[in-house]
């Protein structure tokens, strides 16, 4: 799942999961509801609660740092200035019988973007160079790449490494070509990195 526009849509997703989720499915949830320390205006507490319930049913989730704070109740002000160990500890608090991996995305530290991959064995950090601000759609591309690779049989950490390499090239090219950030990134020539 990704962005959910209404309570009605969330309930349809829950009904689908009740019918089809089993040990042979991989449920990847990108709990889109917040960024840069702020919950999106269209999300009320009930919508945030619905996304949190979905995340708890997933096998893998990919919250950004703000979404991790919403899911865990941690302070964004504190966690955004913390090191990866503290972020991994917060992410690990979400792990349960179903949720086996939490990938915290897009953590900006100086000239680097970190992604923390936490599972029951611990955590790893996957980093890339930061190129200016953010481009529209990169979170969606990341989630799609990791979801596709894990369904194909890749471990979540390996899938994250490939997705980060894929996106780093696309973002670098878009930055160097002065692509309007609202138009997304030039990713097509990097699709081979996902094979």
Where do the language-model regions lie?
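Glycine/small-residue-rich loop that forms an oxyanion/phosphate-binding "nest" at active or ligand-binding sites
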Residues: 1-53
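Glycine-rich beta-alpha junction loops
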Residues: 3-5, 33-35, 67, 106-110, ...
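Hydrophobic residues at beta-strand termini and immediately following loops
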Residues: 126
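Gly/Ser/Thr-rich beta-alpha loop segments that engage phosphate groups in nucleotides
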Residues: 4, 108, 139-141, 145, ...
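Short, small-residue alpha-helix embedded
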Residues: 69-70, 132-156
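Conserved phosphate/ATP/ADP-binding segment of small-molecule kinases
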Residues: 41-123, 157
